[in-house]
Regions:
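Conserved active-site alpha-helix within GNAT-family acetyltransferase domains
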Residues: 94-121, 128
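Conserved GNAT acetyl-CoA-binding A-motif
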Residues: 82-95
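Conserved beta-strand in the GNAT
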Residues: 34, 41-51, 55-62
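Short, small/polar residue-rich loop motifs at catalytic or cofactor-binding pockets
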Residues: 28-29
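Conserved acetyl-CoA-binding loop-helix of GNAT-fold acetyltransferases
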Residues: 63, 69-82
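Short amphipathic alpha-helix that is part of the acyltransferase structural core
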Residues: 1-24, 34-37, 41
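Hydrophobic, well-ordered beta-alpha structural blocks that scaffold small-molecule cofactor pockets
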Residues: 45-47, 74-79, 99
Length: 134
C-alpha cells in the first residue's frame, strides 16, 4: 500500500533515510509518500523536494532491507513521478544512475544543473546528477 505520509510517519521516515545512508536534511513528512506493509509498518519512503531556485529533486528514496528487491522503491518512484510530471533532478551514488535511467532520467553535466545542484554537487563528491524532462 502506498499513501501520503502523515505526521505519525515522521520518525519512521527519518530512520529509513538514516539507515539508507541518505542525507537527512530537508525531511518534511508532508512531501513524502510511504509504502506500508500488511502489518501497518512503514517499509519505504520517498519525496520530491523543492529548492529555492525552483528546481525539484526526487530524493530520500529508501526501503527497509528485508523489502528491497520486491518493487517497493519502483512503486514509490512511479507514484512520485506521476504526481510531479515536470522536470525533476536527482543525485545518487555513482553506479546507481542506471536504476533511474529506467524512469527516463539521464546523466547531465555541470552546465545543465540548476544552481542549487551545481553548488551541492561540488560538496557531494562521488555522485551522479540526473534529470528527467517533464
Amino acid at each position: 500500500l502506498l499513501r501520503a505520509a502523515t505526521a505519525d510517519d515522521s520518525r519512521a521516515i527519518h530512520r529509513l533515510v538514516i539507515s539508507g545512508g541518505i542525507n537527512p536534511t530537508g525531511l518534511d513528512w508532508r512531501r513524502f509518500v510511504v509504502a506500508i506493509s500488511a502489518q501497518g509498518e512503514v517499509i519505504g519512503c520517498g519525496q520530491v523536494k523543492p529548492h529555492r531556485d525552483g528546481s525539484l529533486e526526487l530524493a530520500s528514496i529508501a526501503v527497509t532491507p528485508e523489502w528491497r528487491g520486491q518493487g517497493v522503491a519502483r512503486a514509490i518512484i512511479e507514484r512520485l513521478l506521476a504526481e510531479n510530471p515536470g522536470a525533476l533532478y536527482l543525485m545518487c551514488r555513482s553506479g546507481l544512475g542506471g536504476l533511474y535511467e529506467k524512469f527516463g532520467f539521464r546523466v547531465i553535466q555541470e552546465d545543465e544543473m540548476p544552481r542549487y545542484f551545481h553548488k551541492i554537487s561540488r560538496l557531494a563528491g562521488l555522485v551522479e546528477m540526473l534529470r528527467r524532462d517533464g
